[in-house]
């Protein structure tokens, strides 16, 4: 049995070699000749999986180590009897912490308290719901917009997009990409919506590039109307609009979900799915794969305020470390993908062990995902 895996999937060789012969390949483009001699294909979001890629090959199973699946033609796979699995929620925590890193940076730069801002979350799935929980733990007001969930009657106080645009100071998008249908998200953030953003608003897109009309956004930014923009995803990736990158506050190379933990979850989820598919079901404990974190222990004295949270969050991950490299190479062919391929190891807040002499600080940090304990001062 031969299994092709994307070369940027951590722990893939270690895990999938338990099931057969493993060959690592680049995700963009996949070497077609390798597909003719493989039984299974494990990819990331950079690989378009469809009839043109797989027709006539012996591939019997496709796994994507990603939460999103818009790069996979699931209907065609089903029609051909090819097994499929994604990794829903694998990088949700990573994306949430990316958003927090950006917001804490902007709050420090512009001198505002996050508790004084209302955050509109558009798309309340694995990422959006976790973001809501952490924001509300800090006492930050959230507005939720998720038309499909609202239509299903799911529990939650869902607002319309009009209400969110009208009331929110921050708009952060965490939707799938739907190019048509009743819940189309292609250019969900269009020229009309962009015009309606209040002065000083913050716009964050960490889901799919085409959710935001990049040309319309650039037009507003170059018109001198003050809004702050954080973009991790772009129309036309791996090519991007360099003028738009120059105009945004934070721009990164589609790496919001790129924590070591998130990548490892994605790999283990598709590994477990494939092992079940071939009748050799196995389960993997994530902690057995991950290395020790860079920082062993932090001691925190007193209550948790926003500047302290910012220091702790940025000790683990400061979004600016990914903004600067993209600006240096933007517009150079191949460099966008190279940044992703050679991405520096990044951990999640749970990797940071924080000893707190204040019980309320420990409790709040735990709600935010840190590995915090209360250790009274003596």
From Swiss-Prot:
It catalyses: 4-phospho-D-erythronate + NAD(+) = (R)-3-hydroxy-2-oxo-4-phosphooxybutanoate + NADH + H(+). One of its GO terms (molecular function) is NAD binding. It comes from the Bacteria. The active site is at 208, 237, 254 (proton donor). GO terms for cellular component: cytosol. Keywords: Cytoplasm, NAD, Oxidoreductase, Pyridoxine biosynthesis. Its EC number is 1.1.1.290. Gene3D superfamilies: 3.30.1370.170, NAD(P)-binding Rossmann-like Domain (3.40.50.720). NAD(+) binds at residues 146, 175, 232, 257. Catalyzes the oxidation of erythronate-4-phosphate to 3-hydroxy-2-oxo-4-phosphonooxybutanoate. Homodimer. Belongs to the D-isomer specific 2-hydroxyacid dehydrogenase family. PdxB subfamily. This is Erythronate-4-phosphate dehydrogenase. It comes from Salmonella arizonae (strain ATCC BAA-731 / CDC346-86 / RSK2980).
């Amino acid at each position: 049995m031969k299994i092709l895996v994307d070369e940027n999937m951590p722990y893939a060789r270690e895990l999938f070699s338990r099931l057969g012969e493993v060959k690592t390949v680049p995700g963009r483009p996949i070497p077609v000749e390798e597909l003719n001699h493989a039984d299974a294909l494990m990819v990331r979001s950079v690989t378009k999986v469809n009839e043109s890629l797989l027709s006539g090959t012996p591939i019997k199973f496709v796994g994507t180590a990603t939460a999103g699946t818009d790069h996979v033609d699931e209907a065609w796979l089903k029609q051909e009897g090819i097994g499929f699995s994604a990794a829903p929620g694998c990088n949700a925590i990573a994306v949430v912490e990316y958003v927090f890193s950006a917001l804490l940076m902007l709050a420090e730069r512009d001198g505002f308290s996050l508790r004084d801002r209302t955050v509109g979350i558009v798309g309340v799935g694995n990422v959006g719901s976790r973001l809501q929980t952490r924001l509300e733990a800090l006492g930050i007001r959230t507005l939720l917009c998720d038309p499909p969930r609202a239509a299903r009657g799911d529990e939650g106080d869902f607002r319309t997009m009009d209400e969110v645009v009208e009331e929110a100071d921050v708009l952060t998008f965490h939707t799938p990409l739907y190019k048509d249908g009743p819940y189309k998200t292609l250019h969900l953030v269009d020229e009309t919506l962009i015009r309606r953003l209040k002065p000083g608003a913050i716009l964050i897109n960490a889901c799919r590039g085409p959710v935001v009309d990049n040309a319309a956004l650039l037009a507003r930014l170059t018109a001198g109307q003050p809004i702050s923009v954080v973009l991790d995803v772009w129309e036309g990736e791996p090519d991007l609009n360099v003028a738009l990158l120059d105009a945004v506050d934070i721009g990164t190379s589609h790496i919001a979900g790129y924590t070591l933990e998130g990548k490892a979850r994605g790999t283990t989820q598709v590994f477990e799915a494939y092992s079940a598919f071939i009748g050799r079901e196995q389960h993997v404990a994530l902690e057995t794969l991950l290395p020790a974190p860079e920082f062993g222990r932090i001691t925190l004295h007193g209550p948790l305020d926003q500047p302290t949270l910012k220091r702790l969050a940025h000790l683990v991950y400061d979004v600016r470390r990914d903004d600067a490299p993209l600006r240096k190479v933007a517009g150079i062919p191949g460099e966008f993908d190279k940044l992703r391929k050679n991405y520096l190891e990044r951990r999640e807040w749970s990797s940071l062990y924080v000893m707190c002499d204040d019980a309320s600080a420990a409790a709040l940090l735990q709600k935010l995902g840190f590995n915090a304990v209360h250790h009274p001062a003596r």
